[in-house]
């Protein structure tokens, strides 16, 4: 072995001796479906959108500042994000 006057790593870093295909995720969790099996899955059916239902409901209503002040933070953010400016009665 060659003598080196400075500190050199004597072992290879972890993973360098393995090919990219052999290196696994650090959690070592086995996937239930392979990549090819997931690609064969039925992607044509999607879950129903909840936002469309709430938008339809909120188009029919108007909101005063008192109504908005009664809402919790999450409900307020969802409402403000889905209603139009003309639905605010106190503006």
From Swiss-Prot:
GO terms for molecular function: metal ion binding; metallopeptidase activity; toxin activity. This protein is a metalloprotease with gelatinolytic and collagenolytic activity and is a component of the non-hemolytic enterotoxin complex (NHE). This is Non-hemolytic enterotoxin 105 kDa component. Keywords: Enterotoxin, Hydrolase, Metal-binding, Metalloprotease, Protease, Secreted, Toxin, Virulence, Zinc. Binds 1 zinc ion. Its EC number is 3.4.24.-. One of its GO terms (cellular component) is extracellular region. GO terms for biological process: proteolysis.
